[in-house]
Amino acid sequence: MIKRELYMSRIRPFIGTELIKVMTGIRRCGKSVMLELIKQELTESGVSPTQFISINFEDMSYSHLQTAQALHDEITKRAKEIGGKVYLFFDEIQEVKDWEKCINSFRVSLDCDIYITGSNAKLLSGELATYLGGRYVEFVIYPFSFGEFMELYRSISPDASIQQCFQKYLLAGGMPYLANLRYADAPSKQYLHDLFNSVQLKDIVKRNKIRDVDLLERIIAYVIANVGTTFSATSLAKFLKNEQRTVAPETILNYIKYCCEAYLFYQVKREDLQGKQILASNEKYYIADHGIREAVFGGNMRDINLILENIVYLELLRRGYEVTVGRTGDKEIDFVCDKRGEKLYVQVTYLLASEETVNREFGAYDSIRDNFPKYVVSLDEFDMSRNGIKHRNIRDFLLAEEWN
């Protein structure tokens, strides 16, 4: 079991506190493993596993606990039987109706330490925020980074070079379970296709009571095909009209929002760096795992420039950056990144193969006058840094402990 220290280092300070620890992220990204890692640390610190109460609400053996009252009664009974402090681990808690009511009740009435996971970004919105009144901390879990992937892939193929690992990562992506399939092509593709269908059905269609599933599938296919490119709901509506589907832009925006809430896509807003304001239209979207894109849509190598962008974007999120697309006049910076006031700029391209490409990628920074780090990231092996702008091979960039 890979340690996932990036997340554990953030969660560790809250272990044992009264704050509810909430882990969210796309289905099968490794949230359950995080619960096991936390149990492992608790056990190593002297807590007996007999104090743990663990429930995965996708397990049919717990189908009788699908309401807040049933769950409350069961946990209260088991906590009394155990005695002393109990550690509650609830996986995919959104399957329980009104679950936030009993979670708050446990926090108030039991001597307990609570950990929950869920596959929807709205988990902490609305009623839960009201019930818990800020007494929780959230951690978004992502599929494997390139570094995590390489660690596991080399446990299967010890002689694989960094280049070979990255080539595999471009197609397979970072979903943890693929290691159990030894990253074999056909089984991996089947697994990712089934995972995509599960996210679409359980976390989007069922949760949002969508009736026009065909329309949803068309919208998802369009966004997947156009990861990393700016488009508007109006342009997508025109595209659908050409397919004899008349759809209001508002409906399209709602469907994409549902996909983002299920962590299938991430929306990146555009920022006018001169006017210092967020622009209202033509956002970009990236997919939670580029391996899913290859399995469902194909073409990762054909669209490698966009896939490299997708990989870098997810790495920026993993490391805690807030990310926008920057616009300066008629030029665009792929990623403007901010973490507690510390900025970072990143341009991503496939290869700096011509003087025109070099001028475009490095020239995007011409009007940026601050002294924050500026990167151009590509698959080129040779360092082409210039004018204070750092050039990095994408593998080195992804594996670097820090960027400065």
What are these regions (language model features)?
Residues 2-16:
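Pre-Walker A adenine-sensing motif
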Residues 23:
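Hydrophobic anchor at the beta1->P-loop junction of P-loop NTPases
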Residues 31:
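Conserved lysine of the Walker
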Residues 34, 38:
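Hydrophobic positions on the alpha1 helix immediately C-terminal to the Walker A/P-loop
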Residues 54-84:
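Short glycine-rich substrate-engagement loop in P-loop NTPases that contacts/grips substrate
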Residues 121, 126-230, 263:
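Interdomain motor-coupling "hinge/lid" segment immediately C-terminal to the ATP-binding subdomain
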Residues 183-343:
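Accessory nucleic acid-recognition modules appended to NTPase machines
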Residues 326, 350-395:
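Catalytic cores of nucleic-acid endonucleases
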